[in-house]
Amino acid sequence: MMGIQILPPQLANQIAAGEVVERPASVVKELVENSLDAGASRVDIEIDKGGSKLIKIRDNGSGIPKDELALALSRHATSKLHTLDDLEAILSFGFRGEALASISSVSRLTLTSRTADQTEAWQAHAEGADMAVKVMPAAHPVGSTIEVVDLFFNTPARRRFLKSDKTEFTHIDEWLKRIALVRGDIHFTLTHNGKTVRNYRPAMNEAQYLQRLTQVSGRPFAEQALKIECQHDDLRLSGYLQSPWSPVITDTHYFYVNGRLIRDRLVNHAVRQAFAQKAELEQPGYVLMLDIDPHQVDVNVHPAKHEVRFHQSRYVHDYILQALQSALEEAGELNVVHSSSLDEVEDVFVDSPTSAVGIAAPFALGADTLESAQPLVASAAVQVKSAGAGREGASFGTQTNAFGSMATSRDSSRGSYSASESRQRTELPSKAAIASYGALLQTPAYSVKNHDYQPSLPMPAILDSQYWVMATADKLSLLPIKSVALATRCQEIEAKLATGLIGQPLLMPVSVAADADWQAVLDEHDTLIRQLGLELTIRYQQLIIKKVPPYIRESQLAKVIPEWLQSLRFETPAPSALAFWLAKHSLTGFVSAPEIWAAFSQLAEEKKQLIANKAILLPWQSWLEEQASE
């Protein structure tokens, strides 16, 4: 057995590089973060062959003095902190002083830099484990340029594990998207094999930032995102949250703490819990930025700084949850029609009773026409059109931003309606006609008392296979069929939970890698797990799923069950939350509108009214009066 000895610096740096330099994207991350710490307002990234051949980062930051260039390539050398107290309040990206030394130990690295008070630039070169640094004069403006050539040239085993050039560049591009969202003030460019792939111009106002959000997250997310602005004591949460009505499935899940992108189960749980009673989204998208006193968060808990530890984690969780719930509740108060097929009510006009789209004719369920559906109004139709970016349009309670999206913010106007002046108009009805039109609604085809929807009546007409068209004495509204299906299924499951669900054995048990503390979770919540009809065991670090309730049998159990176990770490869910969780996963396929209406009819009156309150109001009278007065 060999005796204990101190490792030589070259070997120590290569071992450290195993944690710091995982792939080319890791190099880009460390070097760009150094540029941001240096106060750069522009960062240009040049990549060749996915980063295996060349990674070049150029910035206009403060630069590095000549006498510190060689020191910058030494291990544990940093300008970010000097005392133990500094480590307790870190605001910079870097602080360990490992990146440049680790990168230079597995590549050929050249660092060229100039400060504002120097008349000339200087260049330092280091190659592999040799650790010898050569410094020579060079030509360069104020700022720094770092070239990393032949990454892993001296560690062939590491080089063999690199993926294709396209895959490695995709990782670089994805990381740049993340940093571009939190540092909107920085101009980023990304070039691959001589071709400019990304050009994120500085975002100096909200409209420009929304343009960047569109570039990174896509127009569908940006158009319907809810803006978040919330502050309490030393906590401030800002950013954008996916609209609960958005049908878009997005991979935008970015959370930042003091400008640093992190992954945190606490945050994911808060977001899912906020959406739990608001939408059927499996993974709602978000770009959230939390500013917190640096003394209240420890960023030195992960080798790649991907995780942090909050000193008051429960307080932070509840703060985020409450802020998101407030935003969702306020958005719900806006009478907004959020749908891929009903984003914009383009025109309201008098049409013939045989109109194929609208209120004038009976609606269809699938291919079958509902013979029993009575016309609500004999001569009116609503034409529906998807909202397009950069196009003038009408919207309920939305605020059109500078780049043509329809992001709903917390200070959006409520219940307002605006129409494009450039739209072609048909002849509008007179005020007398409007009054007559209102009188028709005063005597609907079936009686409605106290604005309550009577389930004993025939099923209402269906619009776009998604909504029931509901009428009261003087109102028209759209009731989402999927929301009713979810609510009725919740009621059914919650009633059965009192006596316990009967689990169904799986033909082939599902096995998932188990976290270290899952056994403790299973032991603590054994009664609850049995009540749900679940049979879960852990053997050889594997979670084995043997029985599940019928409501989630068709779900992706390898994903659904682990996520639920993670949530149990934070709290024991109430029966209503359990019912919602099961119901959400049971409605992934086709649902029958008549069956849903029949189930809705069996609910107690107060339950029916709560569901009916989810209907989206169509303020047709105010709009018609507004048009007639012009």
Swiss-Prot record:
InterPro entries: DNA_mismatch_repair_CS, DNA_mismatch_repair_MutL, DNA_mismatch_S5_2-like, HATPase_C_sf, MutL/Mlh/PMS, MutL/Mlh/Pms-like, MutL_C, MutL_C_regsub. Residues 398-425 are annotated as: Disordered. The keyword DNA damage applies. Residues 398-408 have a biased composition (Polar residues). GO terms for cellular component: mismatch repair complex. The keyword Phosphoprotein does not apply. One of its GO terms (biological process) is mismatch repair. One of its GO terms (molecular function) is ATP binding. Keywords: DNA damage, DNA repair. It holds the Pfam family DNA_mis_repair. This protein is involved in the repair of mismatches in DNA. It is required for dam-dependent methyl-directed DNA mismatch repair. May act as a 'molecular matchmaker', a protein that promotes the formation of a stable complex between two or more DNA-binding proteins in an ATP-dependent manner without itself being part of a final effector complex. Belongs to the DNA mismatch repair MutL/HexB family. This is DNA mismatch repair protein MutL.
